[in-house]
Amino acid sequence: DKYTIQLNDIYGLQLGDSEHILSSGKEEILLEIDDLTFKLLPMKSAPMEMQISNIYDVKIMGGCKGLFAEAFYYLNSERIGPRNYQMIDSKVINNCGVYGENTVHLLNSVATDKVDSARCFDLVEDKKVNTVGKQVEYWMDYIIPGIEISTDDITDLRVSKMRLQQSALDTGFLSPYNFGFGISYVLPIILTGLIAKEGSVFLVENPEAHLHPKGQSHIGYFLAMMAMAGVQVVIETHSEHVINGIRIAALKNGMDPNDISINYF
């Protein structure tokens, strides 16, 4: 069987046609998988052969149909910054969207759902409520101290509203425009990590964006904890602080070093 790979308008991709993704200087592309230990989805194997049939088609031959159709989460490096409102997309369920565009509505929808204990923030004894809303609050405070979040759906307008507050200041909840980009950039990462299905793949680009070094280390720690809880986390990063956060999480929590893979390009 042959299956078409969509190169554009999926997961934020705009790759053009197959001519644009061919390796220059190579007449033949051969993809081989040797001693594969990283599983993408449980109970699925994916031996693949790439066949370039012409400059406009890319085909996959093998057992890869629907490989990313379920239990796959992806956050682009160019996530949405501060917004007062986000449109409610009724077609999207349990996904923040490629750019985090569904984050506010999703958070409001799942706020009372329970979080698996392995993913709960437990570094401080008084932060033990295991709902998604509270766990988002705890982890956000760990990465960007003092931030409180309020969300609401305005259903007749089909929009979701978010307001933010700095707990140390007596200002009340304000527009996200009054705060830095780091909050809006990291919130979909936290929410996705907490709701991702066990065994699913979570791919996130540049989780360090708009965070100071300590925050970068802490988001690395968070993602490592989500991996230890059963989510397969794939990170693209330029930050040594993110990597150090992963190392700290592994050291403190007895993570098997063989479960961590760092590739330098």
Where would I find each of the regions flagged by the language model?
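Phosphate-coordinating catalytic segments in nucleotide- and nucleic-acid-processing enzymes
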Residues: 2-188, 192, 197-198
